Amino acid sequence: MPYSLTEKKRIRKDFSKLHSILKTPFLLTIQIGSFLDFLQMDVPPGKRKDKGLHAAFKSVFPIKSYTEYAELQYSSYHLGVPSFEVKECQVRGLTYAAPLRVKLRLVIYDKESPASEQVVKDVKEQEVYMGEIPLMTPKGNFVINGTERVIVSQLHRSPGVIFEHDKGKTHSSGKLLFSARIIPYRGSWLDFEFDPKDCVYARIDRRRKLLATILLRALGYSTEEILIMFFETISVKRQGSSYLLDLVPQRLRGESLPFDIASPDGEVIVEAGRRVTARHIKQMEKAGMKTLPAPKEFLIGKTLARDLIDAGTGEVLAKANDEITAELMTALEDANIQAFDLIYTNDLDRGSFISDSLRLDPTTTPLEAQMEIYRVMRPGEPPTKEAAQNLFQNLFFNPERYDLSPVGRMKFNRRLGKEDITGPSILSKEDIVDVIKTLVDIRNGYGSVDDVDHLGNRRVRSVGEMAENQFRVGLVRVERAVRERLSLAESEGLMPQELINAKPVSAAVKEFFGSSQLSQFMDQNNPLSEVTHKRRVSALGPGGLTRERAGFEVRDVHPTHYGRVCPIETPEGPNIGLINSLAVYARINQYGFIETPYRKVVDGKVAGEVDYLSAIEEGQYVIAQANAAADEEGRLIDMLVSCRHKNEFTLLPPEKVQYIDVSPKQIVSVAASLIPFLEHDDANRALMGSNMQRQAVPTLRAETPLVGTGMEQVVARDSGVMVVARRGGIVDSVDAARVVVRVNDEETASDEPGVDIYNLIKYARSNQNTCINQSPLVKPGDTVAIGDVLADGPSTDMGELALGQNLLVAFMPWNGYNFEDSILISERVVEEDRFTSIHIEELTCFARDTKLGPEEISSDIPNVSEAALSKLDEAGIVYIGAEVKPGDILVGKVTPKGETQLTPEEKLLRAIFGEKASDVKDTSLRVSSGMQGTVIDVQVFTRDGVEKDTRALEIEEMELAKIKKDLRDEFRIVETDIYQRLEKVLVGKTVEGGPAELKAGTQITQNYLADLPRERWFEIRLRSEEAGRQLESVAGQLKEQRVAMDEKFQQQRAKLTSGHDLPPGVQKMVKVYLAVKRRVQPGDKMAGRHGNKGVISTIVPIEDMPYMEDGTPVDIVLNPLGVPSRMNIGQILETHLGWAAKGLGRKIGALLESGEQASELRVFLDRIYNASGKKEDLNSLSDEEVLELANNLKDGVPMATPVFDGASEQEIKTMLELADLPTNGQTNLYDGRSGEAFARPVTVGYMHMLKLNHLVDDKMHARSTGPYSLVTQQPLGGKAQFGGQRFGEMEVWALESYGAAYTLQEMLTVKSDDVNGRTKMYKNIVDGDYRMEAGMPESFNVLTKEIRALGIDIELEQD
């Protein structure tokens, strides 16, 4: 495979042995694919599938009026174009959404015609606006009110039927109580359960339980029908004084009968009282016994299967399910009943559960049963016949109230063993009976219960599906209103637009995207955190679990997680196991189940075919691991192969294997697949490692890890933070803010411009206040192909993910500074800005309309010194580039204040300075404490009709100039292309005449055209009519392009100059962006990729750091005790390999310095790249490319060791040897302060370290005087509130134990909530008097009030 533009600049040495046959899929498909299915935007209305918006409309429409003479039908819908681009929405604080227009048809029927064959009287069709639908950006997130949000997929219980037992927890005897539950997609849940006495009960929506037979009766079944459905029958015929029973020999197994069993010829097979064995049964079958003579007594206690009626009198002698007694037998004999049926039950595997339940059942008719159900569902309401029937009908048999969904129906039918997996979305009588039958079978010992946590019983609801459900909710609300108004439609001649109010729909959609539990603020720390957030699968949320209720089993790793959900990446804490991450290759099928790919294995040979299997399908196959040994042709060569079958690991011969894993990294998620040597780390630490990578702050200069896994490129590409070429071509121009590409002719469609302009994002703020900045990688003249990286984004380096920095690390103790995982770093790391990051704070100032008049943004602020206003322009807004510190004014603002009684001093001031000083107060936006930085951008938003200030106009001008430049460049390139094509047409043509004394009959030359100004080319008159027409068409094309450019410019101008949509009451809004540069400092949290985290304890001068024999000081010192107990040995292997990578880079640098030719470099590079692992095709590179590659490798040869398929110990040693480094990875270090060697060799090497977003600057906080709580008058807590430190119970004990009474009193009164005391204290300190008078704490008053609230009068007696 040829290298891309960036790949060939720096090739990663890959140690993988297994050739990956399946490319890593696009990582955001789960989001983007789901939402595209929901919108079906580019599908013509006639061809739309029954899902998403289309399905929602179809499920609610047509809406009929109550009289059924008017009907509103749905025809189709289309989505308009969003008013603003994604970027504009973010700046203006708007939602990126498209207007939805629906074509509706109002049909009015003739009232005279009969209802059966209605005659259409009138049809009106109209497009109706139905609100706005938020659109997904190409990166898979949404912009809601200007902030980027992600809709997390939900893992919920699949609809269908599930059988389980209580594990013996309900009853004290430990008896297993079985239950079945029918879960619909929407509608009432139906449960069936056994009680300890073995009767079957039903519950609807977890209400009070009622007998299952009541439900069966409500469905219209009689006692007799119920018995015949659930039991086999035994026919009994009377023969003299004894009775003949139908004999099925198998039924007698294990029984002991009170009489002899004899064959027809009189031979006794089983004696009375003996147990019947399999041998006896064989003898009976051999003897051909069809009936069994039994005495009358044997039948007593058995149960009748059918009603017995005296044929002569019509009298009912016995009812179905009656137990036979001696009296009944006599009555039957008297009535001369010759034959009757019994139900067949036994204690072993034919329980009489339904029969027992029927005996307890008080109801006899369907209506009585329905009334009983009504009483349970609506307790306290008197039931009527209609109400009871309607309620029961609506519970499970009304498509509007109950929906199993195609998934539910498929799961339901599969579980009950039906062939056909399709069917109605409501339940049928047969469905309910089948479920009870299966439940009884399981209780009887046939079949087994289901595993609730099996991924075949849990499905994923993605964005599209959840949005569709919300949309349907909105439509149902609209439907009620429409139905009311439809009756007016014909009399008042209304149109569809007047019938529909789109508010409820847009409100439902807005609520879902804005405030649903699964609509989350996007984690935008770095590209990886964005990707993982979009691939997250949560079991929480509406219709899911809650943290408190979720038990251990739900959270645990399940065998079906293999290849579907990552067993490693999940949060620590209360959400552990409830929030998971999709595995790298996993995808979601049409039913919402997670599938994972496997390669087919036929007769022990791996085929090229790849099949995706869901958890249900996977169980029946034998699946080998990706690393199973195979020869060149793909034959499995081991005698026994490690396989998975039915969720268990086992060893089987190769010919039994049916599938094999696609890749070793199949089982882990994206974040875990970025950890090198993951196979050498303990799972708990790997979990921390994958979670901490998501918290890494993008550094000023990204540095790709020396030891990676090969997934870095995939994550960076799919995250969308880099600029990737949309079409191939040649780079025309590059600057820091944009890249212009002249597109190849063959990739340009006729209606598209032949130029792509990529505007780069410069210093934008992310959701986490980190900095998003893109910088170009290409040079003018470079040839780029589609998909090539043109510019790096945050935390990417040459198209690869780069979350941290490679540091030279030593594992050794150093003066106790690395106690308890502390980290010691060298001053050089700070000096070189290795971990310096830029954070961008957004500060907003509103100018509102108040009762006393409008607030004003200006630089004329009362009682403020000139120095304080020095950073503001005349409009009162800080200028860009200003360095600001806490307390500085960013936006000057004054608010009118009411007239107050003036003090003599104020009167004097007023007399001197005039009116202004008093009627407004200063409410400027100031820099808050603990924040300082540089102003990098200012945005001014003005409401329509409010005059724009000078600053707003300036910003507008700059934006317009930018747009103009882009359009001009686009036009310039298009124009050049047109003229080049025209030149080909004109050169060599014979002319009639033309400008610059061109004579008729002469031929046009290139020189002539070069001298003639381009715009005059069109004056040339050609002899050939065909060529003349071509000339005219080109002139037309140019004119069109010019007009199009002007139009585009006017549109953009109109957008820019229009007023902004601001919240009510806001006249003007100013946003100021501050860039804060944060160097690494003690207290910052750092970590590696293996869960090895720590806090920086101190920064040591370079000269004091331990140094190696060649004088190189190390960058960072880690505690060796952090490794053995944590069992994350991956970090040590990474350190060794990183050292080798750096050493090889140094050797390449030396070769370059000594002026070696490309051929020598090729030899050395070949030794590195092709000694082991994946082979690289260095011959495809030209000599210049080899030199450029070598130059990029000087700082270290990047290596890739994919998870579970990485570098072996031997390969690491080989690399160290090649780099002329000790193969044990250790070297002698010398103390930087004394110069003496340390006692033993130390493990040294390069490790990729991350700076996490837990910075000491964000946590450090001190309070002087600040806000107090309203009720208790105690200081608030926390940095956000500028709060104080709580002096708690244990702190009080500490002071008590020292007897520091006055300090204690001060703490509990004046420093806390003694309002008068603290005011007095303040005055005393100002007067230089340091005495303290403690008063009554406010919390004491609160206590007295609370005691009074209990009805106890309490008051303080004053002396």
UniProtKB/Swiss-Prot annotation:
One of its GO terms (cellular component) is DNA-directed RNA polymerase complex. Gene3D superfamilies: 2.40.50.100, 2.40.50.150, 3.90.1100.10, DNA-directed RNA polymerase, beta subunit, external 1 domain, DNA-directed RNA polymerase, subunit 2, domain 6, RNA polymerase alpha subunit dimerisation domain, RNA polymerase Rpb2, domain 2. SUPFAM superfamilies: beta and beta-prime subunits of DNA dependent RNA-polymerase. One of its GO terms (molecular function) is DNA-directed RNA polymerase activity. Keywords: DNA-directed RNA polymerase, Nucleotidyltransferase, Transcription, Transferase. One of its GO terms (biological process) is DNA-templated transcription. Its EC number is 2.7.7.6. PROSITE patterns: RNA_POL_BETA (PS01166). Coiled coil: none annotated. It catalyses: RNA(n) + a ribonucleoside 5'-triphosphate = RNA(n+1) + diphosphate. DNA-dependent RNA polymerase catalyzes the transcription of DNA into RNA using the four ribonucleoside triphosphates as substrates. Belongs to the RNA polymerase beta chain family. The RNAP catalytic core consists of 2 alpha, 1 beta, 1 beta' and 1 omega subunit. When a sigma factor is associated with the core the holoenzyme is formed, which can initiate transcription. This is DNA-directed RNA polymerase subunit beta. It comes from Nitrosococcus oceani (strain ATCC 19707 / BCRC 17464 / JCM 30415 / NCIMB 11848 / C-107).
